[in-house]
């Protein structure tokens, strides 16, 4: 239902470039292990952090849908962002918007205030699939 009005595959395609290029992600390590964000970017093959560009949850007495994508600036020139914004608003106004996850407000505020631990992406090693098979 979330992507009913936004043409997409089950993976990122050209439609997503405008939305994800230079966009920030949220570190969702504090969320339940089995929660999958509706928009979940892939980290590198070195590190597999739990990241999201959108979450939906019940918080306090309401429902929350939060995204890090820019769906508000220059919509007259950004057709993809304009369509994603419309799709999200229509979804939130529909009966289909029923978040399965309930979070305390502190988890949401921590997304804005806590600094994620640094990740060192530098390596001198090769990916496992490129290493020689030693016996």
Regions found by a protein language model. Give the residues of each.
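Catalytic beta-strand/loop cores that center a nucleophilic Ser/Cys/Thr
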Residues: 1-79, 97-135
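Short amphipathic C-terminal alpha-helix that caps PH/PH-like domains
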Residues: 80-93
């Amino acid at each position: 239902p979330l992507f009913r009005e936004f043409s997409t595959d089950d993976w990122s395609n050209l439609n997503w470039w405008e939305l994800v290029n230079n966009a920030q992600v949220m570190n969702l390590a504090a969320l339940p292990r089995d929660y999958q964000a509706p928009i979940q970017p892939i980290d590198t093959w070195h590190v597999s952090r739990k990241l999201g560009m959108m979450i939906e949850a019940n918080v306090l007495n309401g429902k929350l849908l939060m995204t890090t994508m820019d769906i508000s600036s220059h919509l007259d020139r950004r057709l993809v962002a304009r369509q994603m914004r419309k799709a999200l608003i229509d979804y939130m106004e529909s009966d289909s918007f029923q978040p399965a996850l309930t979070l305390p407000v502190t988890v949401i505020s921590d997304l804005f205030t806590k600094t994620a631990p640094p990740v060192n992406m530098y390596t001198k090693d090769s990916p496992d699939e490129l290493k020689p098979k030693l016996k």
